[in-house]
């Protein structure tokens, strides 16, 4: 899935859209996405000017954005609905557990986001998320999301 289709599923835009491409996706199971981290990212101006490091919270946000796409597509599949995003639907990041930051992410890295659906209960979707660079784990977390909007899944 390319950037144009990603924009149909996520309301985020520059500079907060943190996914460049979906590599693999199996609804109700997993998603693999990537973010090419460049020296031109606006957050590097202040984090840190002499030693650029991607803020850990943005690595978590990138994982949550991947989870959002997986959640919307999975909810549609579970309900037997067409695989189309809702015009007024939005997916909210509502919780994080067990977050661990293991390595830094720097300009030139390709961040691979691997998110697996754990469960869905009472409108809350739980995901196991992992971010890697060159096969080395940089961040892990359990992420919770929910959807809202008239036509939300």
From Swiss-Prot:
Coiled coil: none
Top-level taxon in the UniProt lineage: Bacteria
Alphabetical list of Pfam families matching this protein: FabA
CDD domains recorded: FabZ (cd01288)
Catalytic residues (UniProt): 47
Signal peptide per UniProt: none
Record EC number: 4.2.1.59
GO cellular component: cytoplasm; membrane
UniProt keyword Lipid metabolism present: yes
Reaction catalyzed: a (3R)-hydroxyacyl-[ACP] = a (2E)-enoyl-[ACP] + H2O
Main location: cytoplasm
A single GO molecular function term of this UniProt record: (3R)-hydroxyacyl-[acyl-carrier-protein] dehydratase activity
Subcellular location, record wording: Cytoplasm
GO biological process: fatty acid biosynthetic process; lipid A biosynthetic process
The keyword Cytoplasm appears for this protein: yes
Keywords of the record: Cytoplasm, Lipid A biosynthesis, Lipid biosynthesis, Lipid metabolism, Lyase
Matching InterPro entries: FabA_FabZ, FabZ, HotDog_dom_sf
Function: Involved in unsaturated fatty acids biosynthesis. Catalyzes the dehydration of short chain beta-hydroxyacyl-ACPs and long chain saturated and unsaturated beta-hydroxyacyl-ACPs.
Family indicated by similarity: Belongs to the thioester dehydratase family. FabZ subfamily.
Protein name: 3-hydroxyacyl-[acyl-carrier-protein] dehydratase FabZ
Organism of origin: Dichelobacter nodosus (strain VCS1703A)
